[in-house]
Amino acid sequence: MPAATVSFDHTHVISPDPKGTADWYVDRLGGKVERSVTIAGAPQIYVSFGDGAMVIVRGERPGEKAAGKTDLQWGIDHFGMRVTGDFDALCTELRTKDVKFLMEPTVINPTTRICFIEAPDGVSVELLERKD
């Protein structure tokens, strides 16, 4: 048995418009801005979700230059957020807010449905519904 327990804490997103990006997670996915600070010369906004997960959004720091998204890269492809409640109603609401669906809701096994949406700055977010 390990001496420590590891659990997921946050996803960190770098954006040219940190406030707009944080607002997107609040308006589209129901997050809540917990705090907004400046660290190393760049805004950093903490957006929490009901299960304790956090998306931290920050801007470019002085002297940094973001390359932007290019072709497929090794590393993180997307992050997933579990939906509890009415998955279809959430998808309908996201469409009314002009959220781009990268993959429509799809049944991937008898207990799981997923879809992919595009967040600001080309970030891919998987929404999943699991029926236990």
Model-derived features with residue positions:
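Conserved active-site tyrosine of GNAT-family acetyltransferases
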Residues: 21, 25-26, 94, 122
